[in-house]
Design a protein with these regions (language model features):
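Short terminal hydrophobic/aromatic SLiMs and anchors at protein ends
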Residues: 1-7, 12, 60
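Non-catalytic positions within long, well-ordered alpha-helices that form the structural scaffold/packing
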Residues: 54-55, 89, 116, 120-121
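Short, high-confidence coil segments that cap the C-terminus of an alpha-helix
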Residues: 57-59, 93, 124-125
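A glycine-rich helix N-cap at a beta->alpha junction
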Residues: 86, 90-100
């Protein structure tokens, strides 16, 4: 009898161990895809990218890190982060995580660096897929290697280009082209091809993702899906007839850039939008329109921005990220001379300071973000993981992350995090997210209330 009881205990212990291993490793028997996006809003091109990525990688689960209420190019998200989360989940993604605002409105380098830090910390991601204007990821990898290693020849060319008074992106583009051409053994070196690659917004972000993956010695495997239809900033629309036969594209009516869709929303051309977004995205967009919760662009906050800039001392403007070399004086003068953002941008922009950089500076002023804040975001090795929403599969992923990586700061309850977290750097970073939402909601026509981060819980999607 004693022998039987002893054997039974051993058997139970064995199966408990097997169960624990399964709980810890079960999802890792499957493959997980990671996507970094703005989804502003989620449209047919995004659906094409997602479904193509799943098909190529044969993954079972998908995690998306999305920007919140403001974007990397220094503007507003046209709909709030919870509505974007609903769109994302409705279209098949399992888990949605917010990219903190200190990353999401930063330079392409810091945007990518922050997103990769979060993805890598999860410990469950097998693939990262990003959209690009080329299908040749090897070229992007080669460019990222140059930017990561910064060989002397490249650094000399970069300094030379910056000394011409060019903006950093343009100077870097020219330096890269010069370095690649000088280093190439190909007598038929196609400078036009490389120029198009280096100057395209999605390629630039893709290169930064690759650089960050190398920086953090990540095991995540990158893939790129060539963009279909219109370019990133294009306001044109492409019908499915514009493409070669593709089983995914043939399910879609038309593909237009997020820029085109946002312009159509401003023009109230809702019938055209219907063809450019999945039906679920369209329904959510219409709900936001009816609720008065569309925030089309930074012009919504025009008066607030000019009030802040006029109130700020020149020294305070100089402390805004991306402000250097006396730009603060031009900003202060223009803020007192104009009351229109478009006029302001036109007068201050130069070959050194691009419109996108200036828009980000305006956003930094609006959201009270300083150079010190951006440096803090770079210093944080493991940012918090703010869960915006999940489906049943996504819920399993969250449990898997919590079980395997208890050191990660998972935010599933904002109040609990604010009340209990003792990491000062994470507190400062999260306070910026909360304030950004409070400012964003002032752009609503109706119900422009504060504290939405505390009032809106996790979006739990069920089919």
């Amino acid at each position: 009898m004693l022998l039987y009881q002893y054997s039974l205990k051993i058997t139970i212990a064995f199966y408990c161990l097997i169960l624990l291993i399964f709980l810890k490793e079960g999802i890792k028997l499957s493959k997980v895809l990671g996507i970094i996006a703005e989804y502003n809003p989620f449209h047919n091109g995004h659906l094409y990218h997602f479904e193509s990525s799943k098909k190529l990688t044969k993954t079972d689960y998908t995690v998306a890190i999305i920007s919140g209420n403001f974007t990397q190019r220094g503007s507003t998200s046209i709909i709030d982060k919870w509505s974007k989360t609903k769109m994302t989940l409705e279209n098949g993604i399992d888990l949605v995580i917010e990219l903190p605002v200190l990353y999401s409105i930063s330079s392409a380098e810091n945007f990518a660096d922050g997103a990769i830090k979060i993805l890598n910390s999860l410990g469950i991601i097998d693939y990262l897929s990003f959209g690009s204007e080329t299908s040749d990821i090897d070229i992007l990898k080669n460019i990222s290697e140059i930017l990561y290693n910064e060989p002397n020849g490249y650094k000399k060319l970069l300094k030379k280009e910056l000394d011409k008074g060019l903006s950093f992106p343009k100077a870097r583009e020219n330096a890269l082209l010069g370095y690649i051409k000088n280093s190439s053994n190909d007598i038929k070196f196609d400078i036009g091809k490389y120029t198009n690659i280096i100057s395209s917004p999605n390629n630039i972000l893709g290169i930064e993702y690759l650089k960050a993956l190398k920086k953090y010695q990540s095991n995540i495997k990158p893939i790129c899906i060539e963009r279909t239809g219109t370019n990133y900033n294009s306001t044109d629309i492409s019908t499915k007839n514009s493409f070669a036969n593709d089983s995914i594209i043939n399910k879609l009516t038309a593909i237009g850039s997020a820029t085109a869709i946002r312009e159509l929303i401003k023009l109230k051309n809702y019938e055209t939008i219907k063809d450019l977004v999945p039906s679920s995205s369209y329904s959510i967009l219409i709900d936001c329109l009816n609720d008065g919760c569309i925030v089309p662009d930074l012009n919504v906050f025009e008066k607030e921005i000019f009030y802040i800039l006029r109130k700020m001392a020149v020294e305070e403007i100089a402390n805004l990220p991306d402000v250097s070399e006396g730009l603060e004086f031009s900003i202060k003068k223009a803020a007192n001379s104009y009351n229109n953002i478009d006029d302001f941008l036109n007068i201050v922009k130069s070959k050194r300071y691009t419109v996108t950089r200036l828009q980000r500076i305006l956003l930094y002023a609006l959201l009270d973000i300083s150079k010190k804040d951006i440096e803090l975001s770079k210093r944080i090795e493991k940012p918090y993981v703010r869960i915006l929403g999940f489906n049943e599969n996504g819920k399993k992923l969250v449990s898997q992350i919590a079980l395997n990586h208890p050191e990660i700061t998972l935010i599933t309850s904002v109040k609990k995090f604010v009340d209990s977290n003792s990491n000062k750097d994470l507190q400062i970073m999260f306070a910026k997210d909360v304030f950004a939402t409070d400012v964003y909601s002032l752009g609503f026509e109706n119900n422009s209330l504060g504290n939405l981060d505390f009032k809106n819980g996790i979006i739990k999607y069920k089919k």
